[in-house]
Regions:
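S-adenosylmethionine/decaboxylated-SAM
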Residues: 1-149
């Protein structure tokens, strides 16, 4: 947990833009911020500590892009919370949505609750109106949700 995803996103961040990074665990957040400040100092990155479902509503953001890679069992809740805030044409990216390919193997879905949750999230996202959903079989799976209007 060194902020690698944040560093990758920051590398392509347009001038005048900002990046908000949330971490639930205070100790991990402190280590990440320390590593980040030593290796990637930037005023474009704002750090927030706390549970995302609690912190996000307080930020008053209208993002173009949201990257979700934690708290997998709440992916649907993050989608419900962030989609109304997302600008039209904005994208949400959810990581690990093939769950080591178990999501596509029916016998694995039957026996593993985490796999069932991830499968349910993908089905839920795909059924939403006014979005375009793409599940990409890259590494552990990426689900992209684009807000159409």
């Amino acid at each position: 947990f060194t902020g690698y995803a944040t560093a990758c996103l920051h590398e392509h961040l347009p001038k005048g833009s900002s990046l908000h990074s949330l971490e639930a665990d205070a100790e991990t957040a402190h280590k990440t911020q320390h590593f980040w400040q030593e290796n990637h100092p930037s005023h474009q990155v704002q750090w927030h500590v706390g549970e995302a479902l609690t912190v996000l509503p307080k930020l008053n953001l209208q993002p173009d892009f949201v990257f979700v890679d934690a708290d997998k069992h709440n992916y649907s809740r993050y989608l419900d919370m962030c989609l109304p805030l997302l600008k039209t044409g904005g994208v949400m990216l959810f990581d690990n949505t093939l769950w080591s390919k178990r999501v596509i193997i029916e016998k694995d879905r039957e026996s593993d609750r985490d796999t069932q949750n991830m499968h349910a999230f993908n089905a839920y996202a795909n059924a939403l109106p006014n979005v375009l959903v793409a599940l990409l079989p890259i590494r552990d799976g990426i689900t992209l949700v684009t807000k159409l209007d």
